[in-house]
Amino acid sequence: MSEVKKIATREAFGETLVELGKKHPELVVLDADLAAATKTAVFKKSFPDRHFDCGIAEANMMCVAAGMSTMGLVPFASSFAMFAAGRAFEQVRNSIGYPHLNVKIGATHAGISVGEDGASHQCCEDFALMRSIPGMVVICPADDVEARQAVKAAYNYEGPVYLRFGRLAVPVFHDDNYKFEIGKGELVKEGKDVTIIANGLMVAEAIESAKTLAEQGIDAEVINIATIKPVSYTHLRAHETPEHL
């Protein structure tokens, strides 16, 4: 049996920016002294004149990105989720969300999976914060394949997008035939007894949980909701039945 390939979604983020950068000269990347960790350093190496390190000043970085977008550029502003959504929330809200500017925020090291980085860096509030901003699209891809497509979808979307990536390498369960769409859920596994809804790295965990439940005679359905906003309520309701938990 072949070993499951594992890749961190932040790796996909950086590599896809380079891919897009080759086709779209208006794409620029901003960082806050974390290019090596957020994996945007590969973009800096390929396009040094289109990468801007704003230093440890995330709030200012968001305002710079906002200004760039008004001049026709498509900025991807990147930092850890704790800083992109937490420290810079006011600037994201007022300078990007309120005027509905075409800025993409790439937030890495999200959730508690950053482990040894400590509680101060374990951002679990970013979903709530970013969803509260009118017009902000919020996406949390589950694996390398979905992350690459999500970055491309964010570029093609006219408006603010918050992309959430993890630090850890996670199993790649999508194949090249998978097509990501903003606002659309995905039925990963069919099941008739219980439904498990997840996103990000928890989708792979949900798949493994479904296997464990199967050993106990429980047929679990797994749904991936990568788009947190706008969420696919239609997709979720389609799987509601009196028999399902």
Predicted features along the sequence, with ranges:
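Thiamine diphosphate
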Residues: 1-164, 169
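Short, conserved beta-strand edge motifs with alternating hydrophobic and charged residues
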Residues: 30, 164, 197-199, 221-225
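Secondary-structure transition/capping motifs at alpha-helix termini
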Residues: 49-50, 214-219
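Conserved strand-to-helix beginnings and helix N-cap segments that scaffold or border functional pockets
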Residues: 89-90, 206-207, 233
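Single conserved hydrophobic/aromatic residue that forms the stacking wall/gate
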Residues: 235-245
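Adenylate-forming
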Residues: 29, 213, 234-235
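Glycine-/acidic-rich phosphate or pyrophosphate-binding loops and their flanking alpha/beta elements
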Residues: 8-20, 42-44, 149-160, 169-215
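Generic long, charged, amphipathic alpha-helical segments
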Residues: 221-236
